[in-house]
């Protein structure tokens, strides 16, 4: 399963982004949150998308960040505008204070917003890696070796299929550096060798 602390509410005419399955679902979620923090249905009906976002971001019990996409031969997401031409404001990522403190097992409320902001920025970075295709997997193969022998046991030929049987695999690695990958693969190979 995939667990994030933040909720992403986004609207875009071309892309389905964030935690909602449609722009309409995002609009309903935004209205519900505005209602929770004191806005009437009439006030919500008069608010623009940006005004609803700003209202939520201004709440003391909410830590949130605006979300922007950069759309040029693919898309990426950030909490800051990347470019005046190809960037679009698409929504927000937020977490409410009570939920954050409970999930992080924190009793001390001091600096909760700064800590939550750091967490949310990391979640946006990971989501952007997903949008950009910076997600990796590894597969460990055990080669299959075919040896043909004569009747007296002499080797006649040897055929090695490097991509033989799959021994193990794992996916869901984001923004790996080669050093990260090497360290992880070395650990996994050592574990498998111990089992054998």
Where are these regions (language model features)?
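Acidic interaction surfaces
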Residues: 1-196
């Amino acid at each position: 399963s995939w667990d994030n602390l933040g909720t992403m509410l986004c609207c875009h005419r071309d892309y389905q982004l964030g935690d909602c399955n449609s722009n309409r679902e995002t609009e309903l979620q935004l209205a519900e949150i505005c209602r929770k923090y004191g806005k009437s249905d009439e006030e919500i009906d008069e608010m623009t998308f940006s005004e609803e976002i700003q209202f939520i971001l201004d709440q003391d019990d909410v830590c949130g960040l605006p979300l922007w996409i950069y759309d040029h031969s693919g898309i990426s997401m950030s909490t800051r505008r990347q470019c005046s031409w190809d960037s679009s404001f698409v929504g927000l990522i937020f977490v409410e204070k009570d939920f954050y403190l409970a999930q992080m097992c924190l009793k001390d409320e001091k600096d909760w917003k700064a800590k939550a902001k750091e967490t949310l920025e990391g979640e946006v970075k990971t989501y952007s890696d997903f949008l950009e295709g910076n997600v990796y997997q590894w597969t460990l193969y055990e080669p299959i070796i075919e040896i043909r022998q004569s009747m007296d046991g002499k080797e006649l030929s040897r055929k090695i299929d490097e991509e033989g049987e799959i021994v193990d695999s794992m996916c869901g690695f984001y923004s790996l550096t080669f050093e990260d990958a090497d360290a992880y693969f070395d650990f996994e190979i050592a574990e498998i060798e111990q089992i054998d």
